[in-house]
Amino acid sequence: MHQTSGSILSPSDVNNLVGIKPTVGLTSRYLVIPISEHQDTVGPMARSVKDAAYLLQAIAGVDPNDNYTLAIPNNGSIPDYVAACDYSALAGKRIGVAWNVIDIYGPIDEPVMTAFMESVALIERAGATIVDANFTAFPEYVQDNNETLVLNADFLTNLATYLSELSYNPNNVTDLQDVRDFTHNFTAEDWPDRDTAVWDDALDNQGWNNTDPRFWAAYQANLYYGGEGGILGALDRENVSAVLLPTQLSPGIPALVGSPVITVPMGFYPADWNVTYNRRNTLVETGPKVPFGLSFMGRKFDEATLIGLAYAYEQRTMHRNDVQPYIIPNIELGDFVK
């Protein structure tokens, strides 16, 4: 799965899955339809931490077609992520909680907060020391627009590069303007009911890409909000191995600096919870037995540590099994790849 700012973590959160959003550069994005070279990453969604570790082991590594992968430490050597699945991984660790993110984003639904507090207590009982690890610049970040500027600017450049590499392009679309024109004129795209507001903002309101001098200031602001004032600063300042948040709150800050996150099932809404829908009234957002997850956020290229911590939590809780799915696939991938 491809994530820019939530597309691994968010669906994993509400589908009772483990999801690993890797460090930007740990896995290749070559020929993945891009949004942002600074935030895009490819990672696994799976039923267990160990399954996700196996998948990450298979897809991580240097690719000459994606120069971001040249940043992988130790000359591109990949750790043994499966071996990192250690029941005792929480023992002796310092684990942070970004309480100010919860306070600022709040109020959080009571079932999620109750499960989160129980998870923090369980992690402490497993031998970890729990400390406050706030994101000091988070109050400024939530009022800031630089992330949108960076994503728009990257998208204008990166999409054109991707389209130029296609060997088959029957409609001769070469940039975002062409893609928007095609979308507006192709009936099956259901425009304007399904709008192109994000593209319109990039093209009509912003109008500059990541080669523009204005890009650098916006990008540096992002690095501050995600770095010293965000997850990286919290990790170093409090000397912790990971920072915890409910997964619904975790994607944004690590995305700014390309740092890794793993989400693990943490619980479910109760059976009598009222159904709430998205703004189009077409998808359930919360409701009876809808799952939610716990995120472990860490340092760049330190996925092995996060996998160990997540595995130790998962094996003590096994929340995935608390509710049985309505539909269970009767075909396994292994049936075809053996």
Label the predicted regions:
Residues 2-99, 117, 121-122, 161-168, ...:
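Structural helix-boundary/capping segments
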Residues 42-45, 88, 102-113, 131, ...:
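Hydrophobic alpha-helical scaffolding
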Residues 89-100, 150-226, 273-294:
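Short helix-loop capping/hinge segments that flank enzyme active sites or metal/cofactor-binding pockets
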Residues 108-136, 158-169, 220-237:
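Acyltransferase
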Residues 135-149, 332-334:
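Acidic helix-start/capping segments at beta-turn-to-alpha-helix junctions
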Residues 255-258:
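Alpha-helix C-terminal capping segments
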